Curated annotation (Swiss-Prot):
Gene Ontology CC terms: cytoplasm; DNA-directed RNA polymerase complex
Protein name according to UniProt: DNA-directed RNA polymerase subunit alpha
Lineage: Bacteria, Pseudomonadati, Pseudomonadota, Gammaproteobacteria, Alteromonadales
Keywords: DNA-directed RNA polymerase, Nucleotidyltransferase, Transcription, Transferase
Gene Ontology terms, MF aspect: DNA binding; DNA-directed RNA polymerase activity; protein dimerization activity
């Protein structure tokens, strides 16, 4: 594959494997080496913490004054009911909040399909169990659903609402993110003759309110918008006095210990008086293999660590070592 060494490969959406109704695997490739983890970790954090969604935030149950109680004729205690309500997968169209009502009587399970709501609300998991009634008992409740982002504990809202909140209105920890679980894996990828590329595989489980491909698109948009400020730095007027460009990349002036090699590899380099990264990159593979006790495994480790920093063996450095290091060598 021909091209400038400064050109980066751009990933493309390769495959979406729908494992089940709420889980999918999204594969993106090719990525430059190291970018699998860079992008995978950034997208994972955004998908978990920053995706907008809807969640239950408040509940009022007839005959219940606080969450540390129980209701006659209901198998579950109030805390269990609140926990089950957190599992509702809901979407709201055209507004930021909605009030749902639930009234049920007679023995049996109370499910999400028993909830009454207007046309702007969709309950994605209607079979979700909220509680169980025994005998000829009933239960009535009002459920507030709001649109938000991230995770907002009930205690955070309680501090600002305690004075105005009526007795019996129970606050619920709100997890607005539609992504329930996210994990990523980086595998090897190949493009023509290049075999040192990354393939990013994102394994995502949602609550069913968002399509996995749309979730990836939204998270990437959020990341791009946050990085726009850094892109605009190029348009800032440069100062009249430009700093003198250093003769060598600062990373070359750092000690070999900063590479965090294994003890065996580090000791072999020290035995050859290789103290700085600039000393190391000028050596060739053949020269290093002649080093006592340094085998192919150690050589591979050294090459991988250098590659992760954009360096390689066999580089030519004019005027090395610099005067600042000459006295130490």
């Amino acid at each position: 594959m021909q091209g400038s060494v400064t050109e980066f490969l751009k990933p493309r959406l390769v495959d979406i494997e729908q494992v089940n109704s709420t889980r999918a695997k999204v594969t993106l490739e090719p990525l430059e080496r190291g970018f699998g983890h860079t992008l995978g970790n950034a997208l994972r954090r955004i998908l978990l913490s920053s995706m907008p969604g809807c969640a239950v935030t408040e509940v009022e149950i007839d005959g219940v004054l606080h969450e540390y109680s129980s209701k006659e004729g209901v198998q579950e205690d109030i805390l269990e009911i609140l926990l089950n309500l957190k599992g509702l997968a809901v979407t709201i169209e055209g507004k930021d909040e909605a009030m749902l009502t639930l009234s049920k009587s007679g023995a049996g399970p109370v499910i999400a399909a028993d909830i009454t709501h207007d046309g702007d609300v969709t309950i994605v998991n209607p079979d979700h169990v909220i509680c169980h009634l025994t005998g000829n008992n009933d239960i009535s409740m009002r459920i507030r659903v709001e649109r938000g982002r991230g995770y907002v504990p009930a205690s955070a809202r309680a501090q600002t609402e305690d004075d105005d909140r009526p007795i019996g209105r129970l606050l619920v920890d709100a997890s607005f993110s539609p992504v329930a679980r996210i994990a990523y894996n980086v595998e090897a990828a190949r493009v023509e003759q290049r075999t040192d590329l990354d393939k990013l595989v994102i394994d995502m489980t949602t609550n069913g309110t968002i399509d996995p491909e749309e979730a990836i698109r939204r998270s990437a948009t959020i990341l791009a918008e946050q990085l726009d400020a850094f892109v605009e730095l190029r348009d800032v007027t440069e100062p009249e006095l430009k700093e003198e460009k250093p003769e060598f990349d600062p990373i070359l002036l750092r000690p070999v210990d900063d590479l965090e090699l294994t003890v065996r590899s580090a000791n072999c380099l020290k035995a050859e008086a290789i103290h700085y990264i600039g000393d190391l990159v000028q050596r060739t593979e053949v020269e290093l293999l002649k080093t006592p006790n340094l085998g192919k495994k150690s050589l591979t480790e050294i090459k991988d660590v250098l590659a992760s920093r954009g360096l390689s063996l066999g580089m030519r450095l004019e005027n090395w070592p610099p005067a600042s290091l000459a006295d130490d060598l």
